[in-house]
Amino acid sequence: MEYSHKSVLLKETIEYLNIKPEGIYVDGTLGGGGHSEEILKRLTTGKLIAIDRDLDAIKASKERLKNYKNVEYINDNFKNIKEILKSLNIDKVDGILLDLGVSSYQLEEVKRGFSYMKDAPMDMRMDKNSPFSAYDVVNKYSQQELERVIREYGEEKWASRIAKFIVKEREKGEIKTTFQLVEIIKNAIPASARREGPHPAKRTFQAIRIEVNEELKGLDKAIEDMVEVLRGKGRIAIITFHSLEDRIVKNTFKKLENPCTCPPNMPCTCGKKPVVKIITKKPVLPSKEEIETNSRSRSAKLRVAEKL
């Protein structure tokens, strides 16, 4: 399959990474390969480690990047960065990039079930080898569990009604497709609320996808691990697409920049030293032009930190 993946905040991310031609870089979310390609264009004797837990993404990007020989493809989760680098006998790297959330090629591949705009089986797995899918969440979670997931990960104010309607509907039979779920969500949200804001199913689909792929679980620890494997002056650039992810990135960077746990008015005795300097005091947002040509970029935020 040919992926028409448009990389978000591409120019800004590459500029902030300060790429050295001889450096070692990690793209922890290879996706359609757009960011990786721009990194590779700037390398001479350097190397890129391209990681994705979606094997389809790796296959597609291998084709796109076939002219480059200095790439190591790894089918794994970026959260395992330490183990991945150890297996490659790499101690430190010069820069790391993460483009979080679902990628446009995953949305475009209808049968994966990520999109609420196309009918497909209830799947949403980024790793197709995982035994746990959106079908399990929708058909097996209790009403209470569903409400928690939709409220917590979707920040959906109608979470209680949506969970109730899902449970009621599945009494008639299994919920097998995305359009079945979209219809249930539409029925659960009052008509007046449906008329404004984004697609009524957007938040619930986001919530289920995050639950299925454990997207937020251990993200803070993964960022800390990545900073640990960075060389001094090396940078980590992270693109997020919703407030939950962005909050984790922002708070983790802050903690690494100011790890001191002493009371504010007292001299520091805890001995915890800053590990990074935050380069982007405010997140970098896409330009109006980018939003016009790539609607996926609308909610994107880029944050960058530099290892001290």
From Swiss-Prot:
PANTHER family named in the record: 12S RRNA N4-METHYLCYTIDINE METHYLTRANSFERASE (PTHR11265:SF0), S-ADENOSYL-METHYLTRANSFERASE MRAW (PTHR11265)
Region of interest: Disordered: 289-308
Record-stated family: Belongs to the methyltransferase superfamily. RsmH family.
EC id: 2.1.1.199
Source organism phylogeny: Bacteria, Bacillati, Bacillota, Clostridia, Thermoanaerobacterales
Reactions mediated catalytically: cytidine(1402) in 16S rRNA + S-adenosyl-L-methionine = N(4)-methylcytidine(1402) in 16S rRNA + S-adenosyl-L-homocysteine + H(+)
Top-rank lineage group of the source organism: Bacteria
NCBIfam families recorded: 16S rRNA (cytosine(1402)-N(4))-methyltransferase RsmH (TIGR00006)
Gene Ontology biological process: rRNA base methylation
SUPFAM superfamilies: Putative methyltransferase TM0872, insert domain, S-adenosyl-L-methionine-dependent methyltransferases
Protein's UniProt name: Ribosomal RNA small subunit methyltransferase H
Entry-linked InterPro entries: RsmH (IPR002903), SAM-dep_MeTrfase_MraW_recog (IPR023397), SAM-dependent_MTases_sf (IPR029063)
Native source species: Thermoanaerobacter sp. (strain X514)
GO cellular component, one term: cytoplasm
Keywords, sorted A to Z: Cytoplasm, Methyltransferase, rRNA processing, S-adenosyl-L-methionine, Transferase
Residues annotated as signal peptide: none
Function: Specifically methylates the N4 position of cytidine in position 1402 (C1402) of 16S rRNA.
Record-listed S-adenosyl-L-methionine binding positions: 33-35, 52, 78, 99, 106
Name of the encoding gene: rsmH
Protein's UniProt keywords contain Secreted: no
UniProt subcellular location: Cytoplasm
MF-aspect GO terms: rRNA (cytosine-N4-)-methyltransferase activity
